[in-house]
């Protein structure tokens, strides 16, 4: 699945939802959590079912983010055909993931949906979540990817640190989460540090630099942006360049020639070619 770019938007704002599929992003997160005021939570739940096919036009995937403390009510409202993923924020234990899995399964059965069709995305946003991250990531087969925290407001508040600073105060946390994901064979969504001292969510240049840096680190999944201005940057940054694609085809061609010999590796034009380099090239393509 190609998931380079996304937009998170309040489901209670019709103009955002109606235009989401035109933004060019690979997925849209219909938000019930932070962007929806407490007094509109009940109303927001009534909008999800119709919003799913609306944002899915043109092949965009529909995700939703529910409220941690309102798991049962929110899950009942969002499990409908066409939804691809539920983002569960502030996940802290494996038991929470298993409880969410059971709820999703219940409604998939009741509504005649394919069992297991909806993924779970766990929000690793607290110190406790980091200590439990391996158990969280392995708690359900619905967890296909792990969002290795980039910090954010919740993690900053939990740790008591400043968020918009010129250094990476979350490097250890991201590393712990990424190692757990790699050990489990899960795809990883995170990014190397690129300073954002102003808190801007619409800096297209910074978004491009961060996406390119992430791809160079073997991270091919983009995040859910908050402003349409960063969508194109994420699409470009997470997409291999023409030169990258050409090089990958060349590497595979050399590897195919190597397969006709008894040698485990070869050197062509100063490049070392073996099965590991071939695997890297396949990943690019």
Residue map of PLM features:
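Expand to "…catalyze enediolate/carbanion chemistry for C-C bond making/breaking, isomerization
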Residues: 1-285
């Amino acid at each position: 699945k190609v998931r380079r770019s996304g937009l998170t938007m309040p489901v209670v704002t019709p103009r955002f939802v109606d235009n989401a599929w035109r933004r060019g992003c690979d997925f849209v997160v219909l938000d019930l959590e932070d962007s929806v005021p407490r007094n509109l939570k009940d109303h927001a739940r009534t909008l999800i079912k119709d919003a799913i096919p609306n944002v899915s036009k043109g092949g965009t995937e529909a995700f939703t983010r529910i409220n941690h403390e309102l798991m049962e009510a929110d899950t009942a409202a969002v499990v409908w055909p066409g939804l691809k993923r539920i983002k569960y924020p502030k996940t802290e234990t494996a038991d929470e993931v298993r409880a969410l899995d059971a709820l999703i399964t219940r409604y998939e059965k009741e509504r005649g949906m394919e069992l297991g069709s909806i993924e779970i995305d766990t929000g690793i946003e607290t110190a406790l979540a980091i200590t439990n991250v391996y158990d969280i990531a392995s708690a359900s087969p619905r967890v296909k990817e792990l969002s290795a925290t980039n910090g954010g407001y919740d993690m900053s508040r939990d740790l008591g640190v400043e968020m918009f600073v010129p250094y990476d105060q979350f490097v250890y946390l991201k590393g712990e989460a990424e190692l757990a994901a790699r050990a489990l064979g899960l795809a990883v969504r995170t990014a190397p540090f690129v300073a954002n001292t102003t808190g801007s969510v619409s800096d297209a240049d910074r978004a491009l630099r961060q996406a390119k840096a992430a791809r160079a680190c073997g991270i091919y999944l983009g995040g859910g942006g908050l402003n349409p201005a960063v969508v194109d940057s994420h699409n470009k940054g997470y997409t291999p360049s023409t030169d990258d694609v050409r090089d990958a085809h060349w590497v595979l061609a050399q590897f195919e020639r190597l397969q006709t010999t008894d040698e485990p590796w070869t050197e062509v034009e100063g490049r070392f070619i073996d099965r590991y380099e071939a695997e890297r090239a396949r990943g690019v393509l």
